């Protein structure tokens, strides 16, 4: 399936797992809530999907890349405790709380959200000492002797063996306890996301002309050459910033993100043409309604890729203006709602309290900032990347 369908399925699963019956108990008992296992090549957006699902479902998110952990941080540190069993005292080994479990409780405390998603990435690439712990985690939803809190949905992700030499295959016993989703790169689906995320229009128009260059992983005698969706998105962010600073991105820089020499060379040449068309056609003048007659004459004779580039430039310019307008409207609406609530509160304030209005207004601001920060900690605030002026 593609990443969009996977996102929808995860979102539906979270809602189903967190649904409660008339007695306030989870409709699907925790023991029947199978963890979701996403399997797919690197860089296709698995982590971003989890952030979107958590935000849209209004739950917290704790994400870990498990290859960054040791058995001690995942399970906890051992310590000796004295116990009385039968008729004698004995020393037994217990463990401190898992760092991962502790981070869930810390997230709950920081955000005020008791339900959430625990996302474990690269779960099938762990070290030999941690592999049994991950199997226990998927099968029993525990780290050591500590269970994942109720109300937390487990989602794990891994890479197929052809993309990672460290991959460990799961046995049938484990696979029979998870919901496996195999994800494949899908350019049309990614373009929907890219437009919403304001991916640089040069990248979008280039991939429109060369869809085969969206995602490739090739191995030869010179090593592995690859380009991923993550690489295109990160390059887009850099191009935006470079344009703002008046800097030029060359092929060497592009190779740092697009680690496929032929594709990097091809895109670098396209990007040079893209900027040339922007200057030659005077995109800002066109958007201002001051297009020169020569522009129309040239456009009639232009090849298809040149016309497509110009359309992308114009759409990027319009996108910048539309987004700025939407952001201004959102700020105005938020200010209006805040002032309306403040006015209601002022109406209930006794008149004989000196400086009461100023104190109330100050407290309203503090409460608003605290609420906003709590939502930010819970990743419930949608912060769409601001598009730069690419025209």
Segments (PLM) and residue ranges:
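Conserved small/polar residues in nucleotide/adenosyl-binding loops
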Residues: 382-391
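Alpha-helical lid/collar subdomain of P-loop NTPases
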Residues: 196-344
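General alpha-helical segment detector with a strong preference for membrane-spanning helices
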Residues: 163, 232-234, 390
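Long intrinsically disordered, low-complexity regions that are acidic and Ser/Thr-rich
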Residues: 346-377
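Active-site catalytic microenvironments for nucleophilic, acid-base chemistry
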Residues: 56, 140, 238-241, 386
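Alpha-helical transmembrane segments and their juxtamembrane interfaces
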Residues: 131-132, 238, 377
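AAA+ P-loop NTPase catalytic core and its hallmark functional loops
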Residues: 1-205
